[in-house]
């Protein structure tokens, strides 16, 4: 089959925004105007096409990025048909992993902002992620019909809060309930959309007289930005010549692709105004797969390789999302970077060195599926029934293996115990959690060896709530969640010598007798964690009983004498003891060793260790004092900060036990504008008061 759309006419874009900036409604309108859906789905009714999980419709927030293919030939059918693959990304901070993951496979992004709320917190986080992956972007200021809407204020915030070189491409005609359309600053015409057909048709009109001066000033700003693309345009512009519409557009495109400017459009998705012109801007200014650098990867011999966006190159693709579909099982969303693949072909998962057969390939429209026979460079599609693929794996041609850059996912920061409401659901719960962990690399499951409980870990409290919610809805497993847990450890601070343990029962018949003398000493935390040194001389304990002594002590390490937490960083020297020809046994020596260990441990200045997290907070400068004050109250050690005019990074070490509820507290301190990440760093001695409280709680 030949290619239906040339790759130069592909646009793989993400639509990204803060919660409630109207992103899902914007995506809905894109699907409507591009002719994919015939009835507009409103988020207000809980019926939006893109938000396809029940919980999303209930909570009115987008959790899973659905990928959708749409076609667009321009508002006036002025372009040949372009294929736009839209990835809808979540806007909540607990789902930044989804955003990060979609940024990885996009070529460009539309950042949606609310004309009233402006640049909100999550917008700052998403902006930083887009910078990290160098994604060219344009902005759409939505909700121009709302009370308090102010387009130029948002443009100003893009500059001051995000450091963006924001250049308006349009100005709104009116605002709030008087918002009627936009002025196209290149054409210098007002665009008026027809309300009778939900904005499917429009007319160009003269710029309103009261806006003429403003529009000319902003057009000047736009043309100047275009002229900066090259010296010859600059000369023409400075020489007083007019630049043609073509020259302006191609120069602006060049600068957007180089991440030098952000073009700003506006409208009201809800009122069917502006999305159509924003789609034109996607086609005119955002990159095709051929406009971005070739994707880099690692060849089998560890050298660097790359794949260009071309059907001629060997097949390579990246699996960027696994979703569970109630009808067909696992759907693996993948982005094709090079080559062609047909359904039925076998490819290599180069990360796991396993072959996978592409059975059925589907193109997704929100949660509707269309089966297709082949996909080519630049396509985004989903495969059904791949066996052993997880997010971030590379699927490539067997005879040309390559591993594309792996995505990096943050370590989970919060853990809770979870148990099924009924014992009968235990196995079902295990399967459900396993399936959910496969879909979401930032979610982990393990069984706690100390308590036998199932522990789930994720990126925040909302993240885990949604996991439990999905278990109930999709897998029909009801579960109870415990309180967030901290894993403490126990160790000793001083050496003790010559502590004995004797286990003797010798009252007629076969008795039991074991006797050991040990030294106990602290080890370096960087070391092996435990060592056992046998220095028995002259056979005072026969060789066959020595392993039993080691084993008896190791069993005690699992649950320490202080509070029942694992014991770490100590060594044992066995140097004397005695035995009985008849009554000694392995069991007797095991018991003698455990008695000696308990006695020695209590004399060796035992302490409780607590996990310390490495915490990084990114906050606008005006909240630094509050953030540091709050961290200090959490027993943090602040190690330093880095600042630019928009954001301050604070580095600290904080005990994990003090970090529960931090996400919520940080949000309220900074009006939601700060974000943080944390990862385990080390164990350190807990202060006496903290240790006493933990030990007391364990006794209850």
From Swiss-Prot:
Task: State the InterPro entries in the record.
Answer: EFG_II, EFG_III, EFG_III/V, EFG_IV, EFG_V, EFG_V-like, EFTu-like_2, G_TR_CS
Predominant place of localization: cytoplasm
Q: Where in the cell is it found?
A: Cytoplasm
Q: Where does GTP bind?
A: 17-24, 88-92, 142-145
Which Pfam families does UniProt cross-reference here?
Answer: EFG_C (PF00679), EFG_III (PF14492), EFG_IV (PF03764), GTP_EFTU (PF00009), GTP_EFTU_D2 (PF03144)
GO terms, biological process: ribosome disassembly
Give the GO molecular function terms: GTP binding; GTPase activity; guanosine tetraphosphate binding; translation elongation factor activity
Q: Which domain of life is it from?
A: Bacteria
Q: Name one GO cellular component term.
A: cytosol
Could you tell me which SUPFAM superfamilies the record lists for this protein? EF-G C-terminal domain-like, P-loop containing nucleoside triphosphate hydrolases, Ribosomal protein S5 domain 2-like, Translation proteins
Q: Which residues form the tr-type G domain?
A: 8-290
Keywords from the named record:
Cytoplasm, Elongation factor, GTP-binding, Nucleotide-binding, Protein biosynthesis
The function of this protein is: Catalyzes the GTP-dependent ribosomal translocation step during translation elongation. During this step, the ribosome changes from the pre-translocational (PRE) to the post-translocational (POST) state as the newly formed A-site-bound peptidyl-tRNA and P-site-bound deacylated tRNA move to the P and E sites, respectively. Catalyzes the coordinated movement of the two tRNA molecules, the mRNA and conformational changes in the ribosome.
The UniProt entry, under HAMAP family, shows: EF_G_EF_2_B (MF_00054_B)
Homology family = Belongs to the TRAFAC class translation factor GTPase superfamily. Classic translation factor GTPase family. EF-G/EF-2 subfamily.
**What is the name listed in the Swiss-Prot or TrEMBL entry for this protein?**
Elongation factor G
Native species: Haemophilus influenzae (strain ATCC 51907 / DSM 11121 / KW20 / Rd)
- Name of the encoding gene: fusA
């Amino acid at each position: 089959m030949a290619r239906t759309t040339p790759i130069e006419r592909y646009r793989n874009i993400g639509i990204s925004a803060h919660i409630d900036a109207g992103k899902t409604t914007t995506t809905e309108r894109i699907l409507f105007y591009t002719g994919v859906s015939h009835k507009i789905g409103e988020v207000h009714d809980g019926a939006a096409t893109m938000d396809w999980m029940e919980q999303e419709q209930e909570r009115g927030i987008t959790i899973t990025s659905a990928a959708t293919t749409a076609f667009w030939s321009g508002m006036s059918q002025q372009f040949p048909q372009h294929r736009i693959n839209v990835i809808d990304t979540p806007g909540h901070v607990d789902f930044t992993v989804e955003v990060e993951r979609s940024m990885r496979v996009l070529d460009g992004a539309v950042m949606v902002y609310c004309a009233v709320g402006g640049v909100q917190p999550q917008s700052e986080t998403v902006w930083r992620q887009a910078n990290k992956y160098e994604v060219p972007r344009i902005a759409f200021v939505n909700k121009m019909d709302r009370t308090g809407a102010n387009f130029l204020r948002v443009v100003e915030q893009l500059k001051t809060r995000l450091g963006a070189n924001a250049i308006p491409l349009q100005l709104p005609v009116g605002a709030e309930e008087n918002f009627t359309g936009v002025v196209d600053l290149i054409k210098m015409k007002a665009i008026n959309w027809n309300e009778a057909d939900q904005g499917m048709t429009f007319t160009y009109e003269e710029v309103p007289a009261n806006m003429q001066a403003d529009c000319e000033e902003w057009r000047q700003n736009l043309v100047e930005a275009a002229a900066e693309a090259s010296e010859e345009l600059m000369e023409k512009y400075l020489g007083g010549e007019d630049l043609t519409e073509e020259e302006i557009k191609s120069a602006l495109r060049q600068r957007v692709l180089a991440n030098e400017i952000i073009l700003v459009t506006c409208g009201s998705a809800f009122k069917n105004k502006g999305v159509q012109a924003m789609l034109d801007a996607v086609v005119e200014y955002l990159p095709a797969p051929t406009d971005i650098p070739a994707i880099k990867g690692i060849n089998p011999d560890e050298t660097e390789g790359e794949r260009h966006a071309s059907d001629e190159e060997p097949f390579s693709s990246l699996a960027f999302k696994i979703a569970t579909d109630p009808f067909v099982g696992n759907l693996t969303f993948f982005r094709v970077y090079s080559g062609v693949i047909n359904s039925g072909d076998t490819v290599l998962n180069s990360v796991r060195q396993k072959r996978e057969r592409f059975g059925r390939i589907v193109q997704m429209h929100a949660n509707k599926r269309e089966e297709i026979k082949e996909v080519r460079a630049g396509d985004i599609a989903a495969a059904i029934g791949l066996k052993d693929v997880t997010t971030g794996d590379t699927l490539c041609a067997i005879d040309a293996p390559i591993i594309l850059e792996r995505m990096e996912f943050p370590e989970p920061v919060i853990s809770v115990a979870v148990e099924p409401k009924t014992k009968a659901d235990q196995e079902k719960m295990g399967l459900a959690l396993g399936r959910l962990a496969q879909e979401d690399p930032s979610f982990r499951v393990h069984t706690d060896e100390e308590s036998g409980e199932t522990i789930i870990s994720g990126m925040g409290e909302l993240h885990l709530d949604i996991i439990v919610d999905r278990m109930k809805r999709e897998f029909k497993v009801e579960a109870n969640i415990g309180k967030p847990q901290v894993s403490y450890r126990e160790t000793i601070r001083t050496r003790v010598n010559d502590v004995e343990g004797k286990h003797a029962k010798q009252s007629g018949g076969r008795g039991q007798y074991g006797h050991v003398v040990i030294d106990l000493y602290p080890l370096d935390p960087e070391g092996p964690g435990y060592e056992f040194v046998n220095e028995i001389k002259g056979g005072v304990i026969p060789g066959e009983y020595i392993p039993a002594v080691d084993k008896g002590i190791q069993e005690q390490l699992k649950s320490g004498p202080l509070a029942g937490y694992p014991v770490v960083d100590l060594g044992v020297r066995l140097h004397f003891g005695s035995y009985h020809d008849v009554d000694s046994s392995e069991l007797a020596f095991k018991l003698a060793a455990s008695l000696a260990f308990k006695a020695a441990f209590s004399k060796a200045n035992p302490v409780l260790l607590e996990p310390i997290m490495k915490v990084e907070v990114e906050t606008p400068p005006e909240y630094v004092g509050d953030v540091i004050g709050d961290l200090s109250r959490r027993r943090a050690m602040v190690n330093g900060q880095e600042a630019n005019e928009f954001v301050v990074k604070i580095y600290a070490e904080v005990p994990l036990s003090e970090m529960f509820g931090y996400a919520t507290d940080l949000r309220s301190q900074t009006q939601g504008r700060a974000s943080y990440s944390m990862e385990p760093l080390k164990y350190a001695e807990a202060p006496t008061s903290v240790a006493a409280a933990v030990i007391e709680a364990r006794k209850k």
